[in-house]
Regions:
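Acidic two-metal-ion nuclease catalytic site recognized across multiple nuclease folds
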Residues: 2-3, 171-182, 196, 210-279
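Short, function-defining helix-loop hinge/capping sites that tune catalysis or transport
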Residues: 22-24, 127, 131, 157-160, ...
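Active-site-proximal helix-loop-helix substrate-binding element of RNase H-like nuclease domains
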Residues: 55-58, 65-88, 150-213
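Short helix-to-loop capping/linker segments positioned immediately adjacent to catalytic or ligand/cofactor-binding
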Residues: 19, 113-117, 138, 201-207
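Conserved non-catalytic scaffold segment of RNase H-like nuclease domains
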Residues: 2-124, 128
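Short, glycine/acidic-enriched loop or turn micro-motifs at the edges of active sites
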Residues: 15-19, 152, 215
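Substrate-recognition/cap helix-loop segment adjacent to the acidic, metal-dependent catalytic center
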Residues: 121-148
Length: 279
C-alpha cells in the first residue's frame, strides 16, 4: 500500500478519435495530464497534440455500407471537423506526427506509476489502433505500464445507495441531468460523475481531449481520497468492463464488488489452466 506521504505519479489520458467510418477510433487529438494523485493540490502537468496523419479532410466523412452493393458511401461530415481543423490550423505547434507523440507518451509512462482514463477500454484501444495504423503492432502491449479505469471505479464504488438517494431526492428537471443520452436510465459518464462530485447539475464537458483529461484527473483524486484502499487493492492494474444493467437495476456496491471479484478469480483460474496446458 502506498502511504499518503508518498507520491503516486499518474497519467490520465483522453483521446478524441474518428468514428462511423473506416477510420473508426483512429485518434486525431491526444492529451494527458500527469500529477501526484495522492495530493489534490499537487500541480498538474498537461500535454496535448493533434495527430498530423489523422487530420486529413477526407477522414472526417461518416460513411456506411450500402446493403445492395456492399460499397461504402459517404453519409455526412463529422460535426467536430470544423472546430478541430480551425484550432489545429490556428495552433500549428500542437500538430505533431504520430510517432513523435507516442515517443513522448512512452517516456512519460516510463517515469509514472500508472496510466488510465475514465473509459480505459475505449482509450487504450484507440491508442493501439492509431499506433497499429503506422507500425503494424500494438502500442501498450509492447511497453511496461500499470493501467486503471475510472469508469470501473466509479460505477462500482461511487454509484451506491447514497448516490441513488441523492438522485431520487432531486427535482425532476435536475434529475434529468443524470440520465443517459437516451433518457431511459441513469448515466455514468465522466460528465455525469463530475456533476455528482461537484454538485453541479448542469456541468457540460467540452469533449476536447485536454479539458476532459483535466476533469478525469480531478475525478481520480476524488476517488482515491474516498476509496484509497479499494483503488490500490481492487482497481489498480485490474481494469474491468462495466455492465450498464448494474446501474439500471441499482445493484448495491457490495454486490457489484462481489461479482467483480468472482470474475477476477475466474480469469486468473483460466490463465492458470492455459499456462499448465502450454507447459
Amino acid at each position: 500500500m502506498i502511504k499518503l506521504s508518498q507520491k503516486f505519479d499518474v497519467i490520465v489520458i483522453d483521446i478524441e478519435a474518428h468514428m462511423k467510418s473506416e477510420h473508426n477510433r483512429k485518434p486525431y487529438h491526444i492529451a494527458w495530464t500527469r500529477s501526484n494523485a495522492l495530493d489534490k493540490t499537487a500541480p498538474m502537468e498537461c500535454y496535448e497534440w493533434y495527430v498530423k496523419e489523422f487530420l486529413h479532410p477526407t477522414m472526417w466523412k461518416h460513411t456506411f455500407t450500402d446493403k445492395n452493393t456492399g460499397e461504402r458511401r459517404d453519409w455526412k461530415i463529422d460535426s467536430r471537423a470544423d472546430s478541430v481543423m480551425k484550432r489545429a490550423m490556428d495552433n500549428p505547434s500542437l500538430v505533431k506526427p504520430l510517432a513523435e507523440i507516442y515517443e513522448i507518451l512512452q517516456m512519460q509512462i516510463s517515469v509514472s506509476d500508472a496510466i488510465g482514463s475514465y473509459n480505459w477500454n475505449y482509450d487504450s484501444k484507440a491508442l493501439d489502433i492509431g499506433y497499429r495504423a503506422l507500425n503494424h503492432t500494438d502500442f501498450l502491449s509492447n511497453i511496461k505500464h500499470t493501467p486503471f479505469c475510472l469508469l470501473d471505479c466509479f460505477a462500482n464504488k461511487i454509484v451506491n445507495k447514497d448516490y441513488f438517494k441523492f438522485i431520487d431526492e432531486l427535482p425532476k428537471y435536475e434529475k434529468e441531468q443524470y440520465k443517459s443520452k437516451s433518457g431511459k436510465n441513469l448515466g455514468y459518464s465522466a460528465e455525469i460523475m463530475a456533476r455528482y462530485v461537484n454538485r453541479d447539475h448542469f456541468y457540460i464537458e467540452e469533449h476536447t481531449a485536454l479539458n476532459d483529461a483535466k476533469i478525469e484527473m480531478a475525478l481520480l483524486k476524488h476517488f482515491i481520497s474516498k476509496q484509497k484502499k479499494s483503488f490500490f487493492d481492487d482497481f489498480l492494474g485490474k481494469p474491468k468492463y462495466v455492465s450498464w444493467t448494474t446501474i439500471r437495476d441499482r445493484v448495491s456496491s457490495a454486490e457489484k464488488m462481489r461479482k467483480r471479484e468472482k470474475k477476477t478469480r475466474q480469469e486468473i483460474e483460466s490463465e492458470r489452466i492455459q499456462l499448465e496446458f502450454k507447459l
